[in-house]
Structures are given as structure tokens and as C-alpha cells.
Amino acid sequence: MKHALVTGAAGLIGSHIVDLLVREGWQVRALDNLEPQTHRRGKPAWINPKAEFIEGDMRNRDAITAALEGIEIVFHQAAYGGYMPEIAKYVHVNSLGTAQMLEVIREKNLPIKKIVVASS
């Protein structure tokens, strides 16, 4: 069985990727920080219950390390997209969070075969 991590799994695109992978028979780990500005009521009901859900932040090295354990492919959809611009937060989450994930993969020599990154 293939093992995938979807970051930003509570978002529109991330949640659909989770659903598709589960339908295709993948073992899916779903990571999202459940940003209160977007997810006021906590974990959304639309997150596929067959996926292992981890509430965690891309800026938290321990959360990223735990989420990557046993994973073969990463669908990286996590991004801060608030509607009250906070430039420093955008940079920390969207750029430095991605860089931190890549550093963890390299430093721990994780056997990730592929990373699919959403970007703008």
C-alpha cells in the first residue's frame, strides 16, 4: 500500500486530494493547522475519516517530522491565505514552512519518492 501525506488537508484542494487518494486505496495522513480565521469551528466534517488526521503547523519542526514518518509521497498544499494581510506570517508559513519540510526530509534522509508542491 502506498503512503501519502497531504499538507493543508482541510483546505479545498487538499481535502479533494485526500478523498481521491483514499478512493484509490492509498494510506493517507492529512496535516492541517486548522487556522482559526479559516476553520472557526475546528476540524471540518468534510475531512475524510479514512485518513489519519494530524493537527499541526508547517512552522513546527516536530509536527512536520512526525507527519513525514513512513511517507512515500507528499502533496504539499499548506499555505496561509488569510484575508487580513500579515506579510511576515505569509512568508513564515508559505516559504519557510516549505523550506523546513525539505530540510527535515534531507537531514533525516527520508525515503520520500516525490513531492508535489502547490505554489503561486
Model-identified regions with their sequence ranges:
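SDR active-site strand-loop-helix element
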Residues: 7, 31, 74-78, 115-120
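Conserved Rossmann-fold NAD(P)-dependent oxidoreductase catalytic core, especially the SDR/UDP-sugar
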Residues: 100-120
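N-terminal Rossmann NAD(P)H-binding glycine-rich loop of SDR-like oxidoreductase domains
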Residues: 4-24
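Short, conserved active-site loop motifs that form the nucleotide-linked donor/cofactor pocket
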Residues: 50-52
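Conserved glycine-rich Rossmann-like NAD(P)H-binding loop of the short-chain dehydrogenase/reductase
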Residues: 26-37
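NAD(P)H-binding glycine-rich loop region in Rossmannoid oxidoreductase-like domains
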Residues: 55-93
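Conserved internal alpha-helix in NAD(P)-dependent oxidoreductase domains
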Residues: 88, 92-99, 113
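Residues at the starts of beta-strands that form the adenosine-phosphate
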Residues: 3, 27, 114
